[in-house]
Amino acid sequence: LDMLIKEKESHIGIDIKEGSMSAYHSTRKRLQEFIQRKYHVSDLAFSQLTENFIYELQAFCLGELGHQQSTFFRVAADLKTVCRLAYREGLADTLLFDKVHIERGDKKAPKALDKEALDKLKALCFDELEKEMGTARDVFLFACYTGAAYCDLMELSKKHLVRDDAGSLWLKFNRQKTGVLCRIKLLPGAVRLIEKMHSDERETLLPHIKYPTYQSCLKALRLRAGISFPFTSHTA
């Protein structure tokens, strides 16, 4: 990636604007953070990459960093460009990720579910073998009530709950993605979900569910509830 950035920088003022370089530096930062967290090293050789790498990177960007699909699409495009450059220069034996399709995503604000769709989700019932489905549904509903991102929801604990002078319950936390302090007054539905999902065996407010599992469950929930709009974690 450093080779690609250096090549692009040599074109500044010719066919590339200086401002556009920030996207490449952002991609480099996200890749490095992912590699350090996942593999506990500062860099990987092309021979160490598998086709699954890009999907794990996607789960990291969307789940842990809280980015939208349109943001990851740019990261994936840069990664593919780097792999083509490496193959061309003889640094990689295979053309990695060439046939992997990544959805572009929508840069516009995600469309929200209407009350009818939310009521359909609330009405769903699950048996003992569908615990993850029930958890995904409740976490998603809590996200709808609060507007909080998945990565923030999974880190919320009892210390983030505060009461004002009127006795109303609030969430107070810093967003992982931006560091901005958020204060969210909890609606009655959100309070009921906290009580429902409460457990003395953990410190977090909500049960942990892995991001890929969460997304898969949301797809299944949509079909089961008969909701036509293809919602994701970002829709909340």
Question: Positions of the model-derived regions?
Answer:
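Short, aromatic/basic-rich helix-turn unit that serves as a nucleic-acid recognition element
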Residues: L1-R28, E89
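N-terminal DNA-binding recognition helix of tyrosine site-specific recombinases/integrases
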Residues: G19, T27-R37, G63-D98, A149-C151, ...
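A Lys/Arg-rich helix-loop hairpin that forms a DNA/phosphate-binding surface
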Residues: G19-S22, I35-F60, P207, S233
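Hydrophobic (often cysteine-bearing) scaffold residues that line and stabilize catalytic clefts
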Residues: S20, Y24-T27, T50, T71, ...
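Short, basic (Lys/Arg/His-rich) helix/loop patches that form interaction surfaces
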Residues: V41, F126-E130, K196-H208, Q215-A236
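Basic, Lys/Arg- and aromatic-enriched nucleic-acid-binding interface segment
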Residues: Q69, F73-A77, A92-Y150, S168
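Conserved tyrosine-mediated DNA breakage-rejoining catalytic core shared by Y-recombinases
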Residues: H101, T146, E155-E195
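Feature representing long, continuous alpha-helical segments
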Residues: D119, C144-G147, C151-E155, I184, ...
